[in-house]
Each structure stands twice: as C-alpha cells, then as structure tokens.
Regions:
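Short, solvent-exposed beta-strand edge segments and adjacent coil->beta transition regions
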Residues: 452-456, 508-510
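Long, charged amphipathic helices and adjacent flexible linkers at domain junctions
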Residues: 433-452, 536-545, 549
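Long, low-complexity, intrinsically disordered segments
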Residues: 572-609
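A generic structured-segment signal
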Residues: 24-25, 472-475, 595-596
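Cytosolic Rossmann-like ligand/nucleotide-binding regulatory domains
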Residues: 466-530, 536, 540-545, 552-558
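Short, surface-exposed ligand-recognition loops at beta-strand->loop->(often short) alpha-helix junctions
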Residues: 457-465
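Low-complexity, charge- and small-residue-enriched intrinsically disordered regions
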Residues: 277, 432, 550-571, 576, ...
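Alpha-helical transmembrane segments and immediately membrane-proximal extracytoplasmic
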Residues: 1-445, 461
Length: 609
C-alpha cells in the first residue's frame, strides 16, 4: 500500500513538474512558431521570386540598370543599419540559435524577431544567395525564449526551462521551414546539443507537433503543399551500380572539407585582416556583386530552391551546371561573411544538388540508366549537407521528408554519408557553424579570459533538478559535475562520481561543479536556477578565496517570502559575520590541479596587462 502511494505521488509530481510544463510551453511556442515561421517562409518565397523577375526586367531594359544598382545600395545600407543596431544579426542565424540552445547567449527577443525578419527580407529582395530556413530556426528559438520569459509569471522555476524551450522553438522553426518534423527534432539533438535525453526529446517533439499542425492547417487552407521538393517516384539503385556511391562519397567528403575550410578562413580574413573595412561597405559590396551576377546569370542567384527543382527536372545542361556550381560556391563563401542576414541550409543543399547533377550526367554518359538521375542528385545533396554540417542522420531524414519519398531504403544514402563523414572526420574539419559560434562567443567577452573555477551547490527539495538524472539536465555552458556528496543510510557522508550521468538527483546532495567559463557569477546564477527551490526566498553570497581563482558558493538564511524587512536585515548581518569567518580560513589542500591552472591563467592575464 505504501509502495503504491509512493508510485502515485511520483507520477503526480512527474506530471506536474515535467509533462505539464513541456506540453504548455511546447504548445505555446509551437503554435507561435508555426504561425510566424509559415508567414516568414511565404514572404521569403514571394520576395525571392519577385527578385528574379526584377532582374529579368532590367536585363530586357538595360537603360534602367543604374536604377537597379542604386536600389541595391539602398537595400545594403538599410541592412547595414540594422546590423549595427541589432547585435543578434551580426552572427550567422544558425550559429545564434545553436548558441542559445547551448546556453552561450540570450536574445533580446523583441528586436531579434523584428530584425531577423526585416533584414532577411532585404537580402531576399536583393537576390542574395540566402535561404529562409536558417532565419526560421532563429525565429523559432527566439519565440521559445520569449515563451519562457512570459512563463516567469506563471511558473516560478521557468529560468531552468529556458534552454529546453529555446530548443523546442528551434526544432519547430526547422520543422515548419522544411516541412520536416522528424528532422527538426533530430537537428536539435544531433547538431545543436550533440546528445540525447528524454526531456530534450519530449520538449522538441511537443513544439514540433503543435507547429506542424498549425503549418499544415494553414497550407491546407491556402492550397499550398508542405513538401519542399516536388518529385515523382524514385528508382531503387541496384547493387551492381554501388560503385557510383564510392565516387559520390569521396567527392562530397573532399568538397565539404574544402568548403568548410574556405568558409572559416574567409571569416578569419574578414575579422582579422579586413577589420578596418566597415561592415556597411562589405554589405554594399556583396549586394552589388549579386546584382552583377543577377544581370549576367539570373538562374544562379537566390536561395536555391528553384535551382534544386530545376536540376531534378533536367532543366540545365552540364555546362550550365558547372558554371553555376563555381558561381554559387564562391558566393556562398563570401556572402555570409559580409554581414548580410540570411540562411545557409538550402544554399548548401543547392551545392550538393549541383554536384549531384554533374555526377549524374557523367554516370549516364558512362552507361548508367537515366532513371537513376534523380536518385543520384538526392543522394549527393544529402551527403554534402551531412558532411558540411556534421549531422548525417539529420541530413538523411531531411531529404526523405522534403521529398516524401523513401528512396533507396536508406542503404545507398547511408553508405555515401558514412564515406564523406569519415573523410571530414579524418581531416578534423569543424562543422560549418562551429567556428562562427565560438568566435561570436569570444567577442561577447572581449578582454576577458576563460578560467577554471570550482564551487559546490546543495540540491534543495522541490528544485528543478530533484528527481531527474544528471544527464537529463542542461547544465550551464562550460560546467561539469565533478563529484557528488550524499548521506548514506547510516548518516555518513559519501563522496562519489557519476561519469555516466545516470544517477538520480536527490534533495540534500552536494554537487561539486567544475566550470571553465568567462563569468563565474553567471555560471553560479544559472546553477541556482536548477538547484534552488523557488518557493523560498534565498539570499546568495559569492565569496572569493584570497589567492585562489575558484569560488565557493555560500548560501545562507532561508527566509519565507512573508517575512519582514527586519528579518532580511538579520540575514545581511549573518552574511557579514560569515564573510569575516570565511576570509580568515586557509585554502584547503584539495583542488590542486584547478588551483595551479587558474594561477597560471591569472599570471598570463597580468603579464598581458
């Protein structure tokens, strides 16, 4: 009977503290993301199509070409003004979203939503090689944070939910942008967090579920298909032609390594060597360059959806595909590093489709049946994207969902993706957005240096982490649980480790945290959101040891919210007394490794100063 009551109590608590918040937050952010991203995607598609028509009109009326370039300069200057006014627009939208999901940054969500949409529309109008999918993910993640911020009014512990809700919003944005719900969930787990946990999975799935319902409902009302690409039934490739897969895998792996390297080097060149060139001038240059390309080769501009569909429909000769490949490859390396706003998912897929079109035509010339052409194009798209993003599962599932076609039963695609992935892994090529994310993270703390700190926190009853496993928690960025101190049945303190992260967190346990961060106070504050019971008012004091780079968290004097200000004054007096006692203590003999590392960091910092 007691056991049944305990199980019933656990289930009620689980529903109240986990399932209900996931459904509520996921439902709100999913519905809002579905509405906003669907509208954004529709506007982006309209502007891109109109941009192509504008370029075609100027080609037929060359007398007015100066007006075209004047208009492009105006668009570029407006984009530069927004770039300067809104910091969230200075970094790639995917890198921004992944940074928010990992806890490396927060949005000012009002200006981010407005700025992302407006600045992206300027890029699409100018014909830049940007897609709508990257900004859609940023919009979704921003809406997730906004939902969480409003949740402060209804859920006391909502700061602890922030990264989960941001993840759910990003997954919803991805799902609506591509019409690929499963890929949206996979993307956040494989690419953003690089981990799988039940809470992350449920949060992402909840948001994606509601966003997909909204998106498909709107699509049904206006008669618009949710599928990204429109193709017929694909032909399964026989085993005797699997030699083509080896060529595709090697070609995509080498090309992805080259692309990621050139993209990263170009970004370094802009930030380090060309830093004196103002951002507005770089943006004006890329708009004008796109204008020249649009007048000469209008099929090569835009996000790339038209190009992919045209390649699948055999609309281009191999000569056109070859020229388009070099033009798009160069533009895609330069454009995102200029400071203009837009996404890279579809442009990257377009590069893969162009390579697939060229290889497909080459294989056909070598005797392969033309019925396998579309299959080769889709396999190459998947492989190139999986290699550049370092997200093979997401790439495979994405192409299947975009086409609504379960081609080649995953086997042929899995082979090529594996080959390409092994190549970029062997060459130690960073994922496409990783470098941009880390650079923006460092710039946010310019003048500071990351140091190692160690502090302890006590888990309170009713806190966010209580009853959950260590691996299920999104701990503050740069923080690792070193060991756990708990009290056994006999009342003795036991010091243990939990490398697998399977241990269930209980109230009263003390967790030692090792943090490699720029701002130790911020790390402590975020840890408090997780381990603190918001039903009680607590005053937190952070004390720094003399000659020690680490910090120790001292939490004192829990007081009820209804206690008077006089009681709060007593709390302050208790802190003053504690500080005097603490500062006279000697440094403990443990933490030698951390103490030495921090000492070296501080010495380097003082030498630099």
């Amino acid at each position: 009977m007691t056991k049944n009551k305990s199980s019933e109590k656990f289930m009620i608590g689980y529903i109240r503290t986990t399932l209900l918040p996931i459904l509520v937050f996921g439902g709100v952010s999913g519905v809002l993301s579905g509405l906003v991203v669907w509208g954004f995607k529709w506007c982006a598609s309209y502007l891109e199509n109109e941009s192509v028509q504008i370029y075609k009109w100027f080609r037929l009326n060359p007398t007015f070409i100066p007006l075209l370039f004047a208009g492009l300069i105006v668009l570029a200057l407006l984009s530069a003004i927004m770039n300067k006014a809104i910091p969230e627009l200075r970094t790639n939208s995917i890198a921004n979203a992944e940074g928010a999901m990992r806890g490396m940054k927060r949005y000012n969500w009002v200006r981010t939503i407005f700025g992302t949409m407006a600045s992206s529309f300027l890029s699409y109008t100018g014909g830049l090689t940007f897609g709508a999918e990257g900004p859609s993910i940023q919009l979704g993640s921003t809406i997730g944070q906004a939902t969480n911020d409003f949740g402060h009014f209804i859920e006391k512990g909502s700061p602890a939910w922030e990264r989960y809700n941001v993840t759910g919003g990003a997954a919803a944005g991805f799902a609506v942008a591509f019409g690929a719900p499963l890929s949206g969930i996979l993307y956040t787990l494989e690419e953003a967090h690089k981990r799988l946990s039940p809470m992350l999975l449920m949060t992402a799935a909840s948001s994606v579920f509601f966003a997909t319902i909204v998106s498909q409902s709107i699509g049904d009302l206006v008669g618009q298909s949710d599928y990204f690409l429109q193709i017929g039934t694909l032909t399964l490739m026989p085993y005797k032609f699997y030699w083509t897969l080896l060529i595709i895998g090697i070609a995509c792996g080498c090309l992805a390594a080259l692309f990621n390297t050139l993209f990263a080097k170009t970004g370094e060149l802009v930030r380090e060597k060309l830093v004196k060139i103002p951002t507005w001038l770089r943006i004006v240059f890329i708009f004008l360059l796109t204008g020249v390309v649009g007048l000469v080769f209008v099929d090569a501009i835009g996000g790339g959806h038209r190009i992919i569909q045209g390649i699948l429909n055999l609309d281009f000769t191999w000569q056109v595909l070859l020229v388009m490949f070099f033009v798009r490859f160069a533009l895609l390396i330069i454009t995102p590093n200029s400071g203009a706003m837009g996404g890279m998912f579809v442009p990257v897929l377009t590069i893969g489709a162009l390579v697939g079109g060229l290889l497909g035509k080459a294989f056909i010339a070598m005797g392969l049946s033309s019925e396998f052409y579309q299959t080769i194009v889709l396999i190459t798209m998947t492989t190139f994207m999986g290699a550049t993003m370092r997200a093979p599962l997401t790439a495979i599932v994405l192409v299947v969902e975009m086409t609504n076609n379960y081609f080649s039963s995953f086997l042929s695609t899995g082979i090529t993706v594996m080959i390409a992935y092994l190549i970029v892994e062997a060459l130690r090529i960073e994922p496409l957005y990783e470098k941009a994310l880390m650079d923006s993270f460092k710039n946010a703390y310019k003048g500071k240096h990351r140091k190692v700190y160690e502090f302890s926190v006590v888990v309170e009853k009713g806190s966010f982490v209580e009853g959950r496993s260590v691996k299920d928690i999104l701990w503050p960025y740069g923080c690792t649980i070193v060991n756990v101190i708990k009290v056994d049945d006999e009342g003795n303190k036991v010091d243990t480790t939990d490398k697998a992260g399977d241990r269930v967190i209980r109230a009263g346990q003390t967790y030692t945290v090792k943090a490699f961060v720029y701002d130790e106070l911020k790390a402590i504050e975020e840890m408090e959101y997780l381990t603190k019971n918001y039903s009680v008012r607590e005053t937190t004091e952070l004390l720094k040891r003399k000659g020690f780079g680490g910090i120790l968290l001292r939490r004192k004097a829990k007081t009820n919210k209804k206690e008077s200000d006089g009681a709060n004054g007593a709390v302050d007096s208790a802190f003053d007394a504690e500080r005097k006692n603490f500062e006279t203590q000697e440094m403990p003999a443990d933490n030698k490794e951390i103490r030495e590392q921090v000492g070296n960091d501080e010495k380097v910092d003082s030498d630099k100063q």
